[in-house]
From Swiss-Prot:
GO biological process: translation
Xref: SMART domains: RL11 (SM00649)
Family label: Belongs to the universal ribosomal protein uL11 family.
Subunit structure: Part of the ribosomal stalk of the 50S ribosomal subunit. Interacts with L10 and the large rRNA to form the base of the stalk. L10 forms an elongated spine to which L12 dimers bind in a sequential fashion forming a multimeric L10(L12)X complex.
CDD domains tied to this protein: Ribosomal_L11
Protein name: Large ribosomal subunit protein uL11
SUPFAM superfamilies in UniProt: Ribosomal L11/L12e N-terminal domain, Ribosomal protein L11, C-terminal domain
Native organism taxonomy: Bacteria, Pseudomonadati, Thermodesulfobacteriota, Desulfuromonadia, Desulfuromonadales
Length: 140
């Protein structure tokens, strides 16, 4: 029989840098999860993506065990990395802070495809382009 799910926790944690301090510790602690066990498992799974922010969905079961699924980094983080900028524009319609090429947008869309609610790559590209525009990035 399947285990009874008692909680779903969604967090965004830097890859390979999960530790028991906030926000990880309190979020897991209130569900009774072994925090160090999660941190070790998460860090081992995300070592290759060092420096990226990784969304993770943790399923907590009634016996205090857990499982987790890592997702692809947020589109905004991938776009900032592609454009080599520290943050997006505070006034995206007026100030353009960087440029990304169509090829870079397509590459990001292909990477994000499993997590996007788009049926084909063209729809995914349009989604990523919209994110880029709202960050003040120019698509060339």
């Amino acid at each position: 029989m399947a285990k009874k799910v008692v909680g779903l926790i969604k967090l965004q944690i830097p890859a390979g840098k999960a530790n028991p301090s906030p926000p990880v510790g309190p979020a897991l602690g209130q569900h009774g999860v072994n925090i160090m066990e999660f941190c070790k498992a998460f860090n081992a799974k995300t070592q290759a993506q060092d420096g990226m922010i990784i969304p993770v969905v943790i399923t907590v079961f009634a016996d205090r065990s857990f499982s987790f699924i890592t997702k692809t980094p947020p589109a905004a983080v991938l776009l900032m990395k592609a454009a080599k900028i520290p943050k997006g524009s505070s006034v995206p319609n007026k100030d353009k802070v960087g440029k990304v090429t169509k090829a870079q947008v397509r590459e990001i869309a292909e990477l994000k495809m499993p997590d996007l609610n788009a049926f084909d790559i063209e729809a995914a590209i349009r989604t990523i382009e919209g994110t880029a525009r709202s960050m003040g990035l120019e698509i060339v």
